[in-house]
A protein has these predicted regions:
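Metal- and O2-centered redox machinery and metal/ROS homeostasis
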Residues: 1-92
Length: 92
């Protein structure tokens, strides 16, 4: 997966979060970014990375997202690796 494909997955995740008031509010509370600002920064790779971190931190939300968009459950983690800060080595 390349950066462009990763950004597409992350934008789908952002759309998924934005469509659910509870989820976007949880993301806003955790990130410290107002919901409107999250949407406005949709083109920001660091914001998209944060969206993916949030998605990957909750298995139920991740599963719902993958089902809603017919995405392989492994794709979000691969997408995250191709966004800013995702190239960190795994030590496990």
């Amino acid at each position: 997966m390349d950066t462009e494909q990763a950004e597409i997955v992350a934008l789908k995740a952002l759309t998924f979060l934005a469509s659910d008031t509870e989820l976007i509010d949880r993301f806003a509370a955790q990130s410290g970014v107002a919901p409107n600002d999250v949407i406005a920064r949709a083109g920001d790779g660091e914001m998209l990375a944060g969206v993916m971190d949030f998605l990957l931190s909750d298995e139920a939300v991740l599963t719902d997202f993958c089902a809603a968009h017919d995405i392989d459950p492994e794709h979000p983690a691969r997408a995250r690796q191709n966004l800013p800060g995702g190239d960190l080595p795994h030590w496990t």
